[in-house]
Structures are given as C-alpha cells and as structure tokens.
Amino acid sequence: MDAARNGALGSVESLPDRKVYMDYNATTPLEPEVIQAVTEAMKEAWGNPSSSYVSGRKAKDIINAARASLAKMIGGKPQDIIFTSGGTESNNLVIHSMVRCFHEQQTLKGNMVDQHSPEEGTRPHFITCTVEHDSIRLPLEHLVENQMAEVTFVPVSKVNGQAEVEDILAAVRPTTCLVTIMLANNETGVIMPVSEISRRIKALNQIRAASGLPRVLVHTDAAQALGKRRVDVEDLGVDFLTIVGHKFYGPRIGALYVRGVGKLTPLYPMLFGGGQERNFRPGTENTPMIAGLGKAADLVSENCETYEAHMRDIRDYLEERLEAEFGKRIHLNSRFPGVERLPNTCNFSIQGSQLQGYTVLAQCRTLLASVGASCHSNHEDRPSPVLLSCGIPVDVARNAVRLSVGRGTTRADVDLIVQDLKQAVAQLEGRL
C-alpha cells in the first residue's frame, strides 16, 4: 500500500497526537483514483452534458461510463440507474413514487381495492422495520402523520437482530404497495434476509394478481453493504436499490437502481425541470461527482473480495483484542449467533456505571469513532434505539461504541485504539 493511500485510508499522523479513524460506516475518505477522476472531469469535462460541443460531449460520455460502472457493481443494467444527490433523496424518491403509483392505480380501478375499512383502503400501506435509517423512517412517519399512508414497522428479532421474513409477510394487506428493508444495518452490521423477502413477495404477487390486487414492490437501502460485500440485484430480486457514494470511498452523491425504470417498475419525479435523467431526476448533472462515483464503483467491482477479506481480518482481530483486554466486561452487541454481518463492523459495550459510550470516546486521545449512527449524534447520551430493538439491555446499550474499520486500517491501529480505550476507562474509573 503506497504512502498516499495509507495516509488517506489508514491511521492519520498529525502533530502532536496520532489519530486513528474507525468510523467508516459514517463516511469514508475518497480513494486517490476517485480524486483524480473528479479533478480531471472538473478540468476537461466542464461543459453542459446536454450540449453538442466537445466539453459537453465529454461530460455526457463520462456520465454514461459512470452509469455503466454502477450497473456492473450491482449486476444491473445501465439504463436502470438514476443519479441522485445521495441516499436520502433516493429513499424519498422511492417512497414518493409508490404513493403516486398507488393513487393512480386506485383511480384506474375505480377504487375497487378490497379493504379493511373505507379509510384504510384509500391509503397506500408500507412495510418496513424498526432499525431503518432515518431517510426511510421519517418520510414514512410524515406520511402517517398527514394521513397519507399506513405503515407497519416490523420489529427485528431480539435473537438475531434481523427483520423476520414471516413477520413481514404477515403484515401484508390488500393495500400494501412497498416493502423496504435495508440490506445491512449501519450500527450492528447485521445482514437482512432481503433475497428471501423478495422471493416470498414475488410468490405472493402471483396470488394477488389472481385476486386483482396490485403488486407489492421491494426496495433495499444498500448504503452500508456496497464496497464491503458483493451486492447483486438479480440475487436480491429487488425492484429498487439505493446507492450511496460516500460509504464506499466515493463522493457525496448517490444513485437509485430501478428495475425496468418507468416500465416494469414505476418511478415518479419529485422535481421538474430540464428533463435530465430521462425526466426522473431533472437538473444539470454534477459531472465531476458522477465521474468520481463511477470510479469508486469500478474499484469495488475489481477489488471487493480483497476489501472484504482485509476488513474481516482486522475486525476479528479487534474483537479478539477487546476481549483479551477487558475480559467479561466486554459485550459484543453486534454478534448474533448464526447471522451474517458486515465484515467491518464491531459494536461493543464496556460494562460499568461510568462508561457510557460517548463518555468513553470523549476521554480517548487516539480513537475517532461514534456511539452509533451519525444522524443521531445530537442524542449521544441516549441508548441506541437500534440496539434496544435488537434486545440489548438498556444499561449495556447506553455504553455502546460503534467501531467500523476501513480498507486501510491495520492491526497496529487496532493495538493503538485498544490501549487508548484502556486508558479512557481507567481515567473514568479514577484509576489514573
């Protein structure tokens, strides 16, 4: 690993203190190749992609190449990729589209949907789970508050941290339009059974069609999984998949995969303007960031197994060192028996009345990390709702720290941060 890469992706050396970043589930730095792609596009492809002169054509070519790169990364078709500003927009676009689709179907069928009650039958029904990202949870809660939708939040299992397939199937109603379940949880790393959910929903749709009921579509937010494990839309069987660049060493834009966009799978724009992205997401394209996203996707396609193996080795070593240093005081919150999880994620608590996660991190001199999802950082003194949903006791969840390693994290980094945690605990317990 060359010096530039190690500086960007591993531990960070600065005077007078050395810092070790272990919050790669929150965001990642840009790979050097990504920075190069972005800067080259800024210099050479600054033209409007809708224009016919050289810099415009070059910009359009870069966008088309990036679209193909993203499609290759997820095993999809280039024409099914829509560029967006990021994961939040992609997730909102899916939810918005399903509300629109439901009402159009209602109009076409003369509101003949079989229903539990007149009020319920006029609203689309969504199914999700209790550990989703805020960009899924909050739009759905907003729809409920404004009486625009019905939502079932399926609890995850307290045994394995997963959304159970049978619970999701049991929640389906005649008015259900979408099941949205994340591919991997950002706090525990637990992989959700999305492939099985899609398979079962597809079988259910055949029965629904015979009864004149609309299809239930499946969406997964793959933000945390991309770049850490192979993601294939054919294996997953999903209709929508959210892509977030800054989680896999790309820029802070994103994309949405839509299977047979506008034909097999409905998509309705939230914005109206110049007609870019086939009118699904208008606005002059951000060519440099799209170039960087395409390069980040290329790197994942070429190196995913190598990245995954390295991160798993470092994460496993981290957990071994934590157990060796803290013994029975350590509780590994992200280890569930028989359940697959992300290779880079370690959520743990050090048990002790003074060892709340945010307090421990505040005493650390080397470690840069968080107690959980970065979007909840203003509530760091509260136990994580995700951990509580997974059956972690309140006193344990309150002490939680989430460490997520990256492509350049080393065993030496792990040794440093374990010693840092040791001194932080000693400080808090008055032993220093």
Curated annotation (Swiss-Prot):
This is Selenocysteine lyase. It holds the Pfam family Aminotran_5. It comes from the Eukaryota. The modification N6-(pyridoxal phosphate)lysine is found at K247. It is an enzyme of class 4 (lyase). SUPFAM superfamilies: PLP-dependent transferases (SSF53383). Keywords: Acetylation, Cytoplasm, Lyase, Phosphoprotein, Pyridoxal phosphate, Transferase. Catalyzes the decomposition of L-selenocysteine to L-alanine and elemental selenium. Gene3D superfamilies: 1.10.260.50, Aspartate Aminotransferase, domain 1 (3.90.1150.10), Type I PLP-dependent aspartate aminotransferase-like (Major domain) (3.40.640.10). The keyword Acetylation applies. Belongs to the class-V pyridoxal-phosphate-dependent aminotransferase family. InterPro entries: Aminotrans_V_dom, Cysteine_dSase, PyrdxlP-dep_Trfase, PyrdxlP-dep_Trfase_major, PyrdxlP-dep_Trfase_small. Its EC number is 4.4.1.16. One of its GO terms (biological process) is negative regulation of cellular response to oxidative stress. Homodimer. Widely expressed. Present in liver, kidney, testis (at protein level). The keyword Transferase applies. The active site is at C375. The modification N-acetylmethionine is found at M1. It catalyses: L-selenocysteine + AH2 = hydrogenselenide + L-alanine + A + H(+). GO terms for cellular component: cytosol. One of its GO terms (molecular function) is transferase activity.
